[in-house]
Amino acid sequence: MLIGDNLSLSAAHLRKDFGVMQFTSLIVFGLVFLVVPMASSQDLGPTGPSPYDVVEGWHKPFAAEGFAFGGNSGVFAESPNRIFISQRGETKLPTPLPLEFAGYVGSIGINALRDTELRTWQNCLMTVDGNGNLLEVWNQWDHLCEDSDGPGPHRVRISPYDPERRVWVINESRHQIFVLSNDGSELLLTLGEKNVSGSDETHFGRPQDVAFLPDGRVLIADGLDNHRIIITDSNGNYLSEFGGFGDGPGQFNGIHALAIGPDGRIFALDRANGRVQVFRLTNDASGEYHPEVEHIAVWSGFGLPLDLIVNEESVWVSDLRPLKMVKLDFDGNRLYTWNVSNDGPSGYLEIHAFSVDTDGNLYGGDNQHGRTQKLIPKANADPRLLIGPPFVQE
């Protein structure tokens, strides 16, 4: 059973606990390392072809002449006919435009993530329909991406437990998180201070993601600088935190994505450490790590894990080096892996974010090629190899 907001401890008390924890961990680290379950980094499990077909040319360009999509950093399928996409501005195209241009900058050798001199902060958030046609462009909020030195928006998420379906946009460069109304008409919350990195209760250091608990609380992956997971109430007010920099159990080197699973499990992509870490929110936590969070497992052997979806019985991770999709059970055993090709017009450089709609269609955002693609299950696909919708507690 999850612990409610009323049982959250004060920040001062938590920091005191963490100080003791860090000192104690130096003494018992070897023992803890032995007892924490770790998935083998050598066992890759079964591998095979993708169970999906790519819908070529799905993401329809709409930019003004001379521009194309930027890095598609976030994608969230609210429904099969309303898909949110966050992009890191648009990319200026060369003049004259090469004949091989196919509607996305990767087709002419431009890297939307790395060729930053071509970036312009416009059309950073959009929705498209199931055919990839533009529904809305929320350019009224482009100013929330401007005036920062870095890649900008990183994720877009909506809580399945929020009746208002508020839209959370994480901007790593500005060290801020914005919460918008579902129709895009209002900026409801601004968390963090513009272009000010910090590690206290009101600041972030390049936040990366959010995940949502059934009781309304929010987990924030804070992220690339602070290497901590913050627990807040539904309006982003600080309650507690856990984590810290390092490569031991419960420590992080860049938390890139978060997801919630059954029985209070928390899954965190520990990117630079090349692993997934698993925690549990529980009334029965020992308190050695955090008053209401226990560390369960470390799953090693990833190259550069980018995003994940947790279902009722499994976890899917998009990984780089090489680019692949990996299915695991809740013990960290690899059940299936399919490699993602960069060949041809439907190739990927990375699947930075992915989402599944209620019809089983998969959407993958490419932060480097600069586009989002839709993948539909093959007619003869084994249902066990398809990515199901994210876990939602009934």
Q: Where are these predicted regions, by residue range?
A:
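Sec/Tat signal peptide C-region and signal peptidase I cleavage site
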Residues: 37-41
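Residue-level detector of alpha-helix boundary/anchor positions
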Residues: 7-8, 13, 33, 213, ...
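Bacterial N-terminal signal peptides that target proteins for export
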Residues: 7, 11-27
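Eukaryotic scaffold repeat domains enriched in small/polar residues
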Residues: 42-394
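Bacterial N-terminal signal peptides
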Residues: 25-36
